[in-house]
Amino acid sequence: VYRCDNDVVDHQVVAMEFENGIAATLTMTAFTPRLTRTVRVMGTKGMIEGDLEQCTVTLQPFGGEAQTFSAEVLGANAYGHGGGDVGLMHDFVLQVRGGGEGRTSAKQSLESHLMAFAAEQARVSGAAVELAAFERSL
């Protein structure tokens, strides 16, 4: 891996500012001692941590006691992305069959993908990307 033309991102920090003034950052790093995905969402009242290997979600209110919940819905070996791929396909098929609204709308999915593509554009160009202008350029 160190002697090839590997240009896969191994560490990235994305800073975003939304129209309503809310700021968010995303940090992705490949350098961890565990071969799993973890998610940490920090808010004003506490944080939420998810661990795909352990199939747990921990709620930690600031100044309060942490609560850990089992998130093993599809089982520990639920295929790609901790069962997320199966869940996405299940939700998609239900929507196509007319089974109602999904967990996220097509508009929300498009917006999240545009943010990811804009973050990649910013990484490659080394410049900040304004999302509306980026979307118009596509």
Residue ranges and their predicted role:
Residues 1-4:
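Short, P/G- and charge-enriched loop/turn segments at secondary-structure junctions
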